[in-house]
């Protein structure tokens, strides 16, 4: 067992809950103790939904364990069916209830309901949230379509209609899924392609039954939909796309792949460079400032891989770290990291990720909510590219990540922290100039002239300093700290560590301005 303050993924029943809450006319009975009802907050607080998840908890307590908990489960299942009247019922158990082995799915199937019942067996102690979501979606599709005929159907050309596709994978608590769906629907409409079903987000069991009416499945989020797409291809002969349209290059490749699978002629407009402002900026003089910037990437497999491609091929960044917390995606991330001359970081320990960030000294971190906190402590700009996320990453406005507009949003989210970082560095460099001195006359007239107290001087220095100082650690003098503060904040941590290592080797007890430049010469030699 591992005790941690933060975790990238919850247990698999949270993934099942995401699928159930994303869909309509479906209910989830979860055999769980009273403490596991916290999951409701994920949707009401972070997603800011106006309704509770369609989940009924058995909420057994310690005193119930001495009796027949199976009867408790059956009672809650009957109440849920009578009250909510779902078209499909999901039945599962949380990590705690798994130990009791009541097998609620089998109990539900023996109660004689005339609706499809999906029994979820999610190994809570070996799998996590994304796997649970993927398995739940797979079981729903397989249960509802198991009797569907596998006979070959007519193509869209034979039926003389526009081609149809399914968009599979978007869920609640996914990263910008709502807006991605709208953007991809708009994008496909421009090329004469209709969307048949979007699932699981917004889909009902009746919509799942319409999945075979499509010509192609678009796998938008492999963590959730890949296993389902493979089953649909194998059993219903529906091919699926493998390119995720994140970034300009990937969007072009996605459109080419989709046109090829649909046997459509690829239009020239797919390759036009004016579809996104990201391409224009990358070709502009202004982008020279960002060329070669060191970037560290960590997130779910889909977004981490896409971020690495965008950073390396479209923005000219240097990727110094690449990793994922999703072990199911590790097989795809490792070769991508190797192609960049890196070793992939596969871990679910946020402290290990923070140590990797310190070691690589990037100028920009692209990660999750946890990397945002780590980067803030280290004084490094950060943009969130993946779940887990907090409420500020679920904007009320339209803010996709996929397609042409998604590339624009990514461009803004990644470039702005670096540009603001340059401004911060310039202010830090010239803060001793007379125009920045506290008490100088302000352009605001009567509101100016009052000195402002700097309440966060440590932020100017750096917060990469070890919290525990031993007798062997050299001490920074005031002159040394002052000179260190003139170094750009995004490399200041690395300079501090190198200087301290040099001072230890040279036997210096104090680090002054001269020691700092001696260390610089030593490491350049």
Curated annotation (Swiss-Prot):
[4Fe-4S] cluster binds at residue 36. Pathway: Porphyrin-containing compound metabolism; chlorophyll biosynthesis (light-independent). Binds 1 [4Fe-4S] cluster per heterodimer. The cluster is bound at the heterodimer interface by residues from both subunits. It comes from Prochlorococcus marinus (strain NATL2A). The gene is chlB. Keywords: 4Fe-4S, ATP-binding, Chlorophyll biosynthesis, Iron, Iron-sulfur, Metal-binding, Nucleotide-binding, Oxidoreductase, Photosynthesis. Pfam families: Oxidored_nitro, PCP_red. GO terms for molecular function: 4 iron, 4 sulfur cluster binding; ATP binding; metal ion binding; oxidoreductase activity, acting on iron-sulfur proteins as donors; oxidoreductase activity, acting on the CH-CH group of donors, iron-sulfur protein as acceptor. This is Light-independent protochlorophyllide reductase subunit B. It comes from the Bacteria. It is an enzyme of class 1 (oxidoreductase).
